[in-house]
């Protein structure tokens, strides 16, 4: 009769050995669902070696991947969120902000400053999705507005790398106001005929998509990034119809004329260098 269960005869006799695998050695790809070796993902710039899906990365990693080494000079680092509405849901808003600061090491969901790409100077802003979903609070809007004014003052191109769930609900109408505030600041930049490049990463949604993220002179995106206003599940439940294949992904938007270019992560830096170099070669107009 076949044995359905294995039973060791004694301690140490032909017993299968337990293999200890270090925690964090492997990671699951959100796109192809493959379990891949983390070191391979890191070597590829946080990109899945199986399907080329770009994993989400933080603001500091993004800076290291895009701008010239050591060239980023942060501005407005002292600005931080308050609690204008005394907001509380399951937690106090102030406690959520403290936890986000501890988790990311940042004061807010966006870093802004001066940088260089390929030796070309520019004003650079980059979102940290790990900070309350990269949500746009009043301080985020203020930092972006000041970055835009800095670009005008110094006659420099502007690059914003977005990764956000939209406006921060804990600040209510004050967060929604940042949509108009950033759009108005970008109108001044456009009036000065200074270039604005918008790079959309996964995810870029809500009030961020409905304002500055889609106002670039050139709008680039990483592959398979989720880009939209409401999420696909909400839309499908509202219209009660199935959504098209790839709906709200960067390739779908490119196909429908809402993006200029979808760029593999390993090519982002060189693509931006060429774009900014083109504008630099044109000599940006004086005021």
Residues covered by each model-derived region:
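N-terminal alpha-helical interaction blocks
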Residues: 1-17
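An N-cap/entry alpha-helix motif that binds or orients negatively charged groups
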Residues: 12-16, 27-28, 55-112
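Residues immediately within or flanking Cys/His clusters that coordinate Zn2+
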Residues: 26, 45
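Cys/His-rich microdomains that often coordinate metals
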Residues: 35-36, 54-55
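Cleft-lining beta-strand/loop regions that shape enzyme active-site pockets
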Residues: 111-190, 197
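Conserved catalytic cores of soluble enzyme domains
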Residues: 162-280
